[in-house]
Protein backbone atom coordinates (compact mmCIF):
# COMPACT_ATOMS: atom_id res chain seq x y z
CA UNK A 1 0.00 0.00 0.00
CA UNK A 2 2.89 2.40 0.64
CA UNK A 3 4.00 2.26 -2.98
CA UNK A 4 0.54 3.26 -4.18
CA UNK A 5 0.46 6.03 -1.57
CA UNK A 6 3.82 7.42 -2.75
CA UNK A 7 2.54 7.43 -6.33
CA UNK A 8 -0.60 9.22 -5.16
CA UNK A 9 1.53 11.91 -3.48
CA UNK A 10 3.82 12.66 -6.43
CA UNK A 11 1.27 15.04 -7.96
CA UNK A 12 1.09 16.96 -4.64
CA UNK A 13 4.88 17.02 -4.06
CA UNK A 14 6.71 16.40 -7.36
CA UNK A 15 10.13 15.84 -5.80
CA UNK A 16 10.19 12.35 -4.23
CA UNK A 17 13.07 13.28 -1.93
CA UNK A 18 11.13 16.23 -0.54
CA UNK A 19 8.07 14.00 -0.23
CA UNK A 20 10.05 11.54 1.88
CA UNK A 21 11.34 14.36 4.10
CA UNK A 22 7.84 15.80 4.60
CA UNK A 23 6.26 12.40 5.25
CA UNK A 24 9.02 11.50 7.73
CA UNK A 25 8.51 14.78 9.56
CA UNK A 26 4.74 14.22 9.71
CA UNK A 27 5.30 10.63 10.91
CA UNK A 28 7.48 11.99 13.74
CA UNK A 29 4.75 14.49 14.62
CA UNK A 30 2.22 11.66 14.77
CA UNK A 31 4.58 9.56 16.91
CA UNK A 32 4.99 12.47 19.33
CA UNK A 33 1.22 12.75 19.83
CA UNK A 34 -0.06 15.03 17.08
CA UNK A 35 -3.68 14.31 16.15
CA UNK A 36 -4.46 12.42 12.95
CA UNK A 37 -6.47 14.09 10.19
CA UNK A 38 -7.60 10.76 8.66
CA UNK A 39 -8.50 7.31 10.01
CA UNK A 40 -5.50 5.16 10.88
CA UNK A 41 -6.91 1.91 9.35
CA UNK A 42 -4.18 -0.16 11.09
CA UNK A 43 -1.46 1.65 9.11
CA UNK A 44 1.87 2.68 10.56
CA UNK A 45 2.79 6.34 11.02
CA UNK A 46 4.75 6.79 7.74
CA UNK A 47 1.86 5.34 5.71
CA UNK A 48 -0.65 7.52 7.57
CA UNK A 49 1.55 10.55 6.86
CA UNK A 50 1.68 9.70 3.15
CA UNK A 51 -2.09 9.19 3.07
CA UNK A 52 -2.62 12.58 4.76
CA UNK A 53 -0.45 14.23 2.10
CA UNK A 54 -2.23 12.34 -0.72
CA UNK A 55 -5.68 13.30 0.56
CA UNK A 56 -4.46 16.87 1.19
CA UNK A 57 -5.58 16.93 4.80
CA UNK A 58 -2.01 18.09 5.49
CA UNK A 59 -0.81 20.62 2.93
CA UNK A 60 2.72 20.23 1.65
CA UNK A 61 3.44 23.91 2.28
CA UNK A 62 2.41 23.82 5.96
CA UNK A 63 4.40 20.60 6.46
CA UNK A 64 7.41 22.23 4.80
CA UNK A 65 7.17 25.26 7.13
CA UNK A 66 6.83 23.07 10.24
CA UNK A 67 9.79 20.94 9.15
CA UNK A 68 11.96 24.03 8.65
CA UNK A 69 10.93 25.42 12.05
CA UNK A 70 11.75 22.11 13.74
CA UNK A 71 15.30 22.20 12.33
CA UNK A 72 15.99 25.78 13.38
CA UNK A 73 17.94 26.35 16.58
CA UNK A 74 18.58 29.43 18.67
CA UNK A 75 22.24 29.92 19.50
CA UNK A 76 23.05 32.06 22.51
CA UNK A 77 26.31 33.96 22.42
CA UNK A 78 28.11 34.25 25.74
CA UNK A 79 29.13 37.85 26.31
CA UNK A 80 32.37 38.37 28.23
CA UNK A 81 32.02 39.72 31.76
CA UNK A 82 32.45 43.44 32.38
CA UNK A 83 36.00 43.10 33.77
CA UNK A 84 37.07 41.02 30.81
CA UNK A 85 35.32 43.38 28.40
CA UNK A 86 37.27 46.38 29.78
CA UNK A 87 40.54 44.51 29.38
CA UNK A 88 39.61 43.47 25.86
CA UNK A 89 38.83 47.07 24.98
CA UNK A 90 42.22 48.21 26.31
CA UNK A 91 41.06 50.11 29.37
CA UNK A 92 41.84 49.41 32.98
CA UNK A 93 39.64 47.31 35.18
CA UNK A 94 37.21 49.36 37.26
CA UNK A 95 38.13 48.36 40.82
CA UNK A 96 38.54 50.37 44.02
CA UNK A 97 42.01 51.73 44.64
CA UNK A 98 43.83 49.86 47.39
CA UNK A 99 45.53 52.05 49.99
CA UNK A 100 48.80 51.07 51.58
CA UNK A 101 47.50 52.29 54.93
CA UNK A 102 48.69 50.16 57.81
CA UNK A 103 46.54 49.32 60.79
CA UNK A 104 48.35 51.88 62.93
CA UNK A 105 47.83 54.67 60.39
CA UNK A 106 44.16 53.73 60.07
CA UNK A 107 43.62 53.90 63.84
CA UNK A 108 45.44 57.24 64.03
CA UNK A 109 43.24 58.64 61.23
CA UNK A 110 40.09 57.42 62.98
CA UNK A 111 41.17 58.97 66.29
CA UNK A 112 41.87 62.30 64.57
CA UNK A 113 38.49 62.18 62.83
CA UNK A 114 36.70 61.53 66.13
CA UNK A 115 38.61 64.28 67.85
CA UNK A 116 37.55 66.84 65.27
CA UNK A 117 33.82 66.08 65.68
UniProtKB/Swiss-Prot annotation:
Catalysed reactions, as listed in the record: RNA(n) + a ribonucleoside 5'-triphosphate = RNA(n+1) + diphosphate
MF annotations from Gene Ontology: DNA binding; DNA-directed RNA polymerase activity
Enzyme class: transferase
Signal peptide positions on this chain: none
InterPro entries: DNA-dir_RNA_pol_omega, Pol_omega/Rpo6/RPB6, RPB6/omega-like_sf
Domain of life (superkingdom): Bacteria
GO biological process, one term: DNA-templated transcription
GO cellular component, one term: DNA-directed RNA polymerase complex
Record's keyword terms, sorted: DNA-directed RNA polymerase, Nucleotidyltransferase, Transcription, Transferase
Pfam families attached to this UniProt entry: RNA_pol_Rpb6
EC number: 2.7.7.6
Keyword Cell inner membrane: no
Subunit structure: The RNAP catalytic core consists of 2 alpha, 1 beta, 1 beta' and 1 omega subunit. When a sigma factor is associated with the core the holoenzyme is formed, which can initiate transcription.
Similarity comment: Belongs to the RNA polymerase subunit omega family.
Role description: Promotes RNA polymerase assembly. Latches the N- and C-terminal regions of the beta' subunit thereby facilitating its interaction with the beta and alpha subunits.
Protein name: DNA-directed RNA polymerase subunit omega
Organism: Cereibacter sphaeroides (strain ATCC 17023 / DSM 158 / JCM 6121 / CCUG 31486 / LMG 2827 / NBRC 12203 / NCIMB 8253 / ATH 2.4.1.)
Higher taxonomy: Bacteria, Pseudomonadati, Pseudomonadota, Alphaproteobacteria, Rhodobacterales
Gene assigned in the entry: rpoZ
Amino acid sequence: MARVTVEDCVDKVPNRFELVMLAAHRAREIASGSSLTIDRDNDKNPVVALREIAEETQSAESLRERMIESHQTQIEVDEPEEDQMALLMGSEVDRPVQDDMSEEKLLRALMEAQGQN
